[in-house]
């Protein structure tokens, strides 16, 4: 099985949860979409390190970390996230 096929099989079912988490953290649709896109790219890049235990938890951890990194990029985003 191709790496991409396996990745899609494991992680695409969690796309809605990934978006919901990113949206909850940053509060804006466009930012959440960008975060999920970046998180999926990071997940694909690090896929060889995935041990297969819990794909949803692994992916959502990447989404959360990507969102927090995103917030740190600009004070305006940080201020919006702090209000939650």
Where are the model-predicted features located?
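Hydrophobic recognition helices of helix-based DNA-binding modules
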Residues: 18, 43, 47, 67-71
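Structural recognition of an alpha-helix C-terminal capping motif at a helix-to-coil junction
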Residues: 34-41, 45, 53-65
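A short, charge-rich alpha-helical start-of-domain segment used by transcription regulators
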Residues: 1-20, 30-36, 44
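Residue-level signature of the cytosolic catalytic core of signaling kinases
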Residues: 3, 51-53
């Amino acid at each position: 099985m191709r790496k991409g096929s396996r990745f899609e099989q494991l992680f695409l079912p969690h796309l809605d949860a990934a978006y919901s988490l990113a949206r909850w953290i940053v509060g804006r649709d466009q930012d959440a979409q960008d975060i999920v896109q970046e998180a999926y790219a990071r997940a694909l890049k690090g896929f060889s390190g995935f041990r297969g235990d819990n794909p949803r938890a692994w992916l959502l951890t990447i989404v959360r970390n990507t969102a927090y990194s995103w917030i740190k990029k600009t004070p305006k985003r940080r201020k919006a996230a702090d209000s939650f």
